[in-house]
């Protein structure tokens, strides 16, 4: 059986069959390459999270207010039993004027220290807005410069990664085609284009033998 056009008609469907089978494997192998690239931007978004916690600082200022308010409470409790004792002494000895004056003198110094913590509260309250104001002013400039530079490298990385990912995919497709289809393609080309030469050679060879 000499190869001729009939061989091309017979083998061409086989060549088409082997040509379209490996194309599915190329798509399956290129899929995980694209999936790995999608995981990279997640790391960039996780960086600005710890920097936001620096703003929470005015908490200790509130604790000082509670301490100042709690200080005068025991002074008022001590003044109440002293006044009751003075009233009891006056009821028992109404004739004596000197002890009542001594008790009144003892009651007066107790009322004086009650006004001192109130005076201490006024400067503390005046200092609070001064301390709270710079905290808010310092927090505002921190948030502005952090958000702007984060978006720029993401866009640059996406532009740089897109052309790099296309080249290896093309190389893999070419290598796979040469490994799977290249051999069949070369055989088909030689059989189709040079089958008539082989045919003439066989005819010439038989003609030489017969002569």
Swiss-Prot record:
Sequence repeats, residue ranges: 56-61, 76-81, 84-88, 92-97, 107-112, 115-120, 121-126, 127-133, 136-140
Listed Low complexity bias regions: 114-152
Expression by tissue: Stolon, also expressed in leaves, stems and roots.
Annotated stretches, region: 9 X 6-7 AA repeats of E-E-P-A-A-A: 56-141
Keyword Methyltransferase: no
Region (Disordered): 114-167
Keyword terms, alphabetized: Repeat
The keyword Repeat is annotated on this UniProt entry: yes
Identification of the protein by name: Induced stolen tip protein TUB8
Name of the encoding gene: TUB8
